Design a protein with these regions (language model features):
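Acidic, metal-coordinating helix/loop segments flanking the phosphotransfer/catalytic sites
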Residues: 21, 35-62
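C-terminal output helix
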Residues: 41, 120-131, 139-147
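Receiver (REC) domain active-site loop signature in two-component systems and cognate sites
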Residues: 67-69
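Short, glycine/charged-rich "phosphate-handling" switch motifs in NTP-dependent
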Residues: 113
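Hydrophobic residue at a beta-alpha junction
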Residues: 71-72, 81
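Conserved acidic segment of CheY-like receiver
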Residues: 5-15, 20-25, 63
Length: 148
């Protein structure tokens, strides 16, 4: 597993963020995690806009993306990522509390790497997060644009 891949966790709910961190550790994922509390923070980091920190060009990233966030929702974040030449290959795992077929279809249409429903129980959620591991193994980042 690529432990140098940084996991970006876009999750506004403190409880869900804590459970996600714990569940990842439980399934053996020990990568650095950077958390964003809303979609705008996530976009600012990825695109280098705003006042805060931004992504580093030579770092591998994997985004765990909640759909229901303030300021900018997860689907808008995913759409923005897929429209950006330097971001579009970044693996994005959607974490959602719903298994709504329309939302799943929308996310798959925007080429999310995986759609994980946040299971009601902790053990089931931890098991579901096993799906994240392959994306750490085969990270497509950092991104190259053909320029040196």
């Amino acid at each position: 597993m690529k432990e140098d891949t940084v996991i970006l966790l876009a999750e506004d709910d403190d409880g869900h963020a804590t459970l996600t961190r714990m569940a990842l550790r439980e399934v053996g994922v020990n990568n650095q995690i950077i958390r964003f509390r809303d979609g705008q923070e996530t976009v600012n980091f990825l695109c280098g806009t705003g006042q805060g920190p931004s992504r580093e060009a030579d770092v591998h990233y994997l985004l765990l993306l909640d759909l229901r966030m303030p300021k900018v929702d997860g689907i808008s974040v995913l759409r923005r990522i897929r429209q950006d030449e330097q971001l579009r290959r970044m693996p994005v795992v959607v974490l959602s509390t719903t298994d709504n077929p329309h939302e799943i279809k929308t996310c798959k249409g925007l080429h999310c790497s995986c759609y994980v429903v946040k299971a009601a129980g902790y053990e089931a959620f931890a098991a579901a997060l096993q799906q994240v591991k392959p994306f750490l193994e085969h990270s497509q980042t950092p991104w190259t644009t053909g320029q040196s």
